[in-house]
From Swiss-Prot:
Disulfide bonds: none annotated. NCBIfam families: GTPase_EngA, small_GTP. Gene3D superfamilies: 3.30.300.20, P-loop containing nucleotide triphosphate hydrolases. GTP 1 binds at residues 10-17, 57-61, 119-122. GTPase that plays an essential role in the late steps of ribosome biogenesis. GO terms for molecular function: GTP binding; ribosome binding. GTP 2 binds at residues 181-188, 229-233, 294-297. Belongs to the TRAFAC class TrmE-Era-EngA-EngB-Septin-like GTPase superfamily. EngA (Der) GTPase family. One of its GO terms (biological process) is ribosome biogenesis. This is GTPase Der.
Length: 437
């Protein structure tokens, strides 16, 4: 199931983005930079005391054509719609402002848990000014300094106390997948077409507190799936609904709630920057990925060469998704749609594949013999052994004499050798370098 969602709201210049980056910072630093992945700080992962959660910085959703107070209200509404817990950020230097009171009133009526963070409390004298914020009616104000990291522990304790316990009954063996992509690539048509292909709809289930509709269905061969709503399709009347950044955020929510992600491209329009944003997030989240090129029926004079050229373009633009299979479909004519359930199941199985340590180390030793380890400043990298420590995605720890001696290119070489020996089509794999004690 998806992680709890924490939204950060507040008027401009109270330090929302600094707080967002401070909470996400340590988690983000763990993930090695992957060439070609464009990061977007609108949405990120956080962790506190072993509790994982996703964060939204609503201030990153731009509505510059709207009056300032209208923008603030809309951002608060987004937080209410999307979040399980809301952090409202205020600035101790300005005291309680009219804009703060407006946001507080909206949040108070929402019945969502709200944690009040009073930012820029950079010295002990400022702590006395914190008590004025009780008048917002949101409970205890937590003094923090997002720049210096002071007070974040107590605030995050309050945040995770409001996480609902996961209901064990919600877990099932169905494969959860979603169609994700920028607006107008044909996600809705694909959803309708694949349900039309399989027809046996078990139920439409209201999923999380955000009321996403997750559709359970059984494919013709008996395989069971849950299609995660990419959300936003069914919601109307919101000024922010059509913004690309909001579409990106909703796609990220669907990715977090899926085992397998189908990245949808529009064959007529080629590859856009937002496609890269969304696909990059799916890769970083460790989800299994299938690239679906929709509207293939609209390409004139299409043949095998046309398909090869488009495939080469995808491989060039999405180099970090070299493991993802590509399928060319048409929601309109239903061309190749029947392949999707089997491809989804295969990617899911590969994502959960486990390799015995003895077999893995045989492959590792062969790789070392074929391409000796690099050296730096007279010191050679020594690789001792490897073991698989997790699935979804498959994660391997490689024990070495000095992790700094393993260059990115050599780690990529070892990953390629592992992929050549074991079929991990459709799933990223993670290699963690660890010093042997």
């Amino acid at each position: 199931m998806a992680n709890p969602v924490v939204a950060i709201v507040g008027r401009p210049n109270v330090g929302k983005s600094t707080l967002f980056n401070r909470i996400a910072g340590e988690r983000i630093a763990i993930v090695e930079d992957t060439p070609g992945v464009t990061r977007d700080r609108l949405y990120a992962h956080g962790e506190w005391l072993g509790k994982n959660f996703s964060m939204i910085d609503t201030g990153g959703i731009e509505m510059s054509d709207q009056p300032l107070l209208t923008q603030i209200r809309q951002q608060a509404e987004i937080a209410i719609e999307e979040a399980d817990v809301i952090i409202m950020v205020v600035n101790v230097e300005n005291g309680v402002t009219d804009a703060d009171e407006q946001v507080a009133q909206i949040l108070y009526r929402s019945n969502k848990p709200v944690v009040l963070a009073v930012n820029k409390v950079d010295n002990p004298e400022r702590r006395l000014d914190v008590y004025d914020f009780y008048r917002l009616g949101l409970g205890e104000p937590y003094p923090v300094s997002s720049v210096h990291g002071v007070g974040l522990g107590d605030m995050l304790d309050a945040v995770i106390e409001n996480f609902a316990e996961k209901d064990a009954e919600e877990e099932d063996d169905r494969i959860r997948f979603s169609f994700i992509g920028r607006p107008n690539v044909g996600k809705s048509s694909l959803v309708n077409a694949i349900l039309g292909e399989n027809r046996v709809i078990v139920s439409d289930m209201a999923g999380t507190t955000r009321d996403a509709i997750n559709t359970q269905f059984t494919a013709k061969d008996g395989r069971e799936f849950t299609m995660v709503d990419t959300a936003g399709i069914k919601k109307k009347g919101k000024l922010y609904e059509n913004t690309e950044r909001y579409a990106l955020m909703r796609s990220m929510r669907a990715i977090d709630d899926s085992d397998v992600v189908l990245v949808v491209l529009n064959a007529e329009e080629g590859i856009r920057e937002l496609d890269k944003h969304i696909a990059g997030y799916a890769h970083e989240a460790g989800r299994a990925v299938i690239i679906v090129v929709n509207k293939w029926d609209t390409i004139p004079d299409r043949d095998q060469r046309t398909m090869t050229d488009f495939t080469n373009l995808i491989r060039h633009e999405f180099q970090y998704l070299s493991y993802a299979p590509i399928v060319f479909v048409s929601a309109k004519t239903k061309q190749r749609l029947s392949r999707l359930p089997e491809m989804i199941e295969e990617a899911y199985d590969h994502q959960h594949r486990r390799i015995q340590s003895a077999v893995l180390n045989d492959v590792l030793m062969d790789a070392l013999a074929a391409n000796p380890t690099p050296s730096s400043n007279g010191r050679r990298l020594r690789v001792y052994y490897a073991t698989q420590v997790a699935v979804a995605p498959p994660t391997f720890v490689i024990f070495v004499n000095d992790p700094d001696l393993m260059h990115f290119s050599y780690a990529r070489y070892l990953e390629n050798r592992i992929r050549a020996a074991f079929d991990f089509t459709g799933t990223p794999i993670r290699l963690i370098k660890r010093r042997r004690k």
